[in-house]
Design a protein with these regions (language model features):
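Short, glycine/charged-rich "phosphate-handling" switch motifs in NTP-dependent
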Residues: 213, 225
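The feature captures the beta-strand-to-loop junction immediately N-terminal to the Walker
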Residues: 43-45
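Conserved ABC ATPase signature
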Residues: 141-145, 149
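Conserved structural motif at the start of ABC-family nucleotide-binding domains
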Residues: 12-14, 27
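Helix-to-loop junction immediately C-terminal to a conserved catalytic motif
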Residues: 58
Length: 244
């Protein structure tokens, strides 16, 4: 299967990116693209390199080689805070909310780059559309929320900077199964407003259900890509990830 569009036209274009930690290669020449206004899933087993790719895109780690372009500009060597200002938000694995702060304060901390108060208020309302329970919990401390609600808060906080691209690392990890569809409904709401989503997920079935396009990573390499629904029916996915 071919990519949905050319590297030059993509909102995000990753080309031949390699990352190593202490001499051990985590990524071995990854190339992928994400079109504007889409959900793109990165699936694969533990150690496949999915998180390393997000860390490279967000400026947390520097690639050994390769190029990362975003909205037409080379961002490969930019610092993490500059990448946020360019319009990329990264919600890492593990929720990482500020437990002693209220839901409202957690959300507003995500909007630290936005000085326009009316813009912050609009983004709060957008967050409540995606995750209505957050409105009801607005003045509660984050520590009082369930694990699923904390994940909703972490994702919503990621949207508060008004990103063009929202990167989510394992949003369903450790979440009660009954709350996972609610989290993914919120992710789809975010994408429907025009924010592109790059989704790392071990829950392959759920990721491919909501994604437009998907890449399969194994040992730091892309081994398959394609339309998410078509990929879900492929023998590779069925045998390797769905147990079919």
């Amino acid at each position: 299967m071919t990519q949905p569009q050319t590297q030059t036209a993509a909102l995000l274009a990753v080309e031949d990116v390699a990352v190593a930690y202490d001499g051990m290669r985590a990524l071995q020449g990854v190339t992928l693209a994400a079109a504007a206004g889409t959900i793109v899933a990165l699936v694969g087993a533990n150690g496949a390199g999915k998180t390393s790719l997000l860390r490279a895109i967000s400026g947390i780690v520097r690639p050994e080689r390769g190029t990362i372009r975003f909205a037409g500009s080379d961002v490969t060597r930019l610092a993490a805070h500059e990448i946020v200002r360019r319009g990329i938000a990264h919600v890492p694995e593990g929720r990482r909310v500020f437990a002693s702060a209220t839901v409202r304060d957690n959300l507003l901390l995500g909007a630290y780059v936005e000085r326009d108060r009316s813009a912050r208020e609009r983004r709060l309302e957008d967050a409540f559309v995606a995750f209505p329970i957050l409105r009801a919990r607005l003045e509660q401390r984050a520590s009082t929320l369930s694990g699923g609600e904390q994940q909703m808060l972490a994702i919503a906080r990621g949207t508060m900077s008004g990103p063009k691209l929202l990167m989510l690392d394992e949003p369903s990890l450790g979440i009660a199964p009954k709350l996972i569809p609610e989290i993914y409904d919120g992710i789809q709401q975010i994408a429907a407003r025009g924010t592109s989503v790059l989704l790392v997920e071990q829950n392959v079935r759920e990721a491919l259900r909501v994604a437009d396009w998907a890449y399969v990573l194994q040992t730091g390499r892309v081994v398959a890509s394609g339309d998410a629904r078509e990929l879900a029916e492929s023998e590779l996915i069925k045998k390797a990830f769905l147990g079919l």
